[in-house]
A protein has these predicted regions:
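Long, charged, helix-rich clamp/arm modules that form nucleic acid-engaging surfaces
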Residues: 245-401
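Basic, nucleic-acid-interacting segments
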Residues: 2-300, 317, 340-342
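Generic N-terminal leader/presequence segments
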Residues: 1-2, 349
């Protein structure tokens, strides 16, 4: 925090995040095309995704259920009626010339998440379809379009401007990531674009009554880059204002190589997109009975799992919190302790295993460690077959083989 304090001395950052979460449904939001990552370009495209004349979208009920789950997990208001709108703009990877989204009647409003004891409000979360992907680095002399992503269901989670530092923005983003992965509505893989973040950043003097002019940083795809991009943007705006300049309301892009943001375009307003209700989709009513059926189908939330681990496994609050921070780790722990000492397993997961994951910047599923070999390792430490020092070497050997 000391670094941030010196960075913003005399200035108060004001930050809001828009988090785009790709939902894990079998098919796309309005078409029967498969929702799947990593397939050959333009092989998962339906006529509806292309917006050809005569085709009509049909809402994916699974995506609606996942949006409701997020609303319930964040103590939000679930819409009694949701309406889809057309957001009109031209871009090569948007063949219809509009995006189907929710402006006035989103599925979720007025949620809240707690981050380090502070409540950060969620303005709304709405369903919308993703655009295709423009690829600029495959050929030297041309750009190409992959429409596999076109129509993939997104839940866009819009926070209120309650965040006051880059590090707090990262903590909030990690909390959102934790919620969506615990609910199994998304894998949250930022490197694959399953979770992307836009950051709205402005600065003001602590005594000011109104927020400053904001810049939006688009499509940041890692926790580390979110922090770096916001910190750069704060410094940039401070430099402008302290030179008696004016911060422009604009959209900016973060360059991770140069560690800087650069201007993309003047920031648009809602009127620029000519929103109007989508004539192809009727309003969708959501009954209380339907919401309750979704609630009954929800997985255990992080706080609930942490409480259970404290009571069932006699873990202290800190250990349970660290293990339950990641659903993969929490499930891994429960598999390991079926045959291994609970406290020793917790110690090794929190310490050595997490250290390896952080060192190599991967998650548990991407590693070569599984519950069986880790449990056997803990058992050998427990019965003094091997020492702790040897166990560390064995863990490293498992890791690389």
């Amino acid at each position: 925090m000391a670094q941030n304090d010196s960075l913003i001395k005399g200035w108060q950052p004001v930050i809001g995040l828009e988090v785009h979460v790709q939902l894990m449904t079998n098919t796309k939001l309005f078409s029967p095309a498969k929702n799947q990552f990593g397939e050959d370009a333009n092989t998962l495209v339906d006529l509806i995704d292309l917006g050809l004349p005569g085709v009509l979208p049909v809402l994916n009920e699974g995506a609606m259920k996942q949006g409701i789950k997020f609303g319930l997990a964040t103590n939000a208001k679930i819409a009694e009626t949701m309406i889809f709108d057309r957001k009109n703009y031209f871009y090569p990877d948007l063949p219809k010339g509009y995006q189907i989204t929710q402006l006035h009647y989103p599925i979720v409003r007025d949620g809240v998440v707690e981050v380090n004891g502070k409540k950060i409000r969620i303005h709304q979360a709405h369903l919308e379809e993703d655009a295709g992907k423009s690829i600029h680095d495959k050929y030297d002399d041309k750009s190409v379009i992959d429409l596999n992503r076109s129509g993939v269901p997104l839940l866009e989670i819009v926070s209120e401007p309650d965040i006051r530092s880059a590090s707090e923005a990262v903590d909030y983003l990690k909390k959102i990531h934790q919620i969506i992965t615990y609910l199994d509505i998304s894998d949250g893989n930022m490197s694959q674009g399953s979770m992307r973040c836009d950051a709205n950043v402005s600065i003001m003097k602590p005594e000011d009554k109104e927020f400053g002019i904001r810049a939006e940083i688009k499509n940041i795809n890692s926790f580390k880059f979110v922090e770096k991009a916001i910190n750069f943007e704060i410094r940039r705006q401070i430099k402008i204002l302290e030179a008696n300049g004016v911060v422009e309301q604009e959209t900016r892009l973060y360059d991770s190589i140069k560690d800087e943001t650069r201007s993309m375009r003047t920031k648009e307003f809602a009127n620029d997109y000519r929103y109007f209700p989508c004539p192809d989709l009727v309003p969708t009513n959501i009954s209380k009975e339907f919401i309750e059926s979704v609630r009954k189908d929800m997985d255990e939330l992080p706080e609930e799992k942490q409480e259970r681990f404290m009571s069932t496994y006699n873990l202290n609050e800190y250990d349970a919190g660290v293990i339950c921070a990641d659903k993969q780790i929490a499930n891994f722990f429960e598999e390991v302790v079926k045959d291994a000492d609970i406290q020793l397993a917790a110690k090794w997961i929190i310490g050595d295993l997490n250290a390896l994951l952080n060192k190599h910047d991967i998650n548990l599923a991407e590693s070569k460690i599984d519950a069986t070999n880790f449990s056997e390792l803990i058992q050998k430490i427990t019965d003094n077959t091997i020492s702790g020092k040897i166990a560390k070497e064995v863990l490293e050997e498992i890791w690389i083989t």
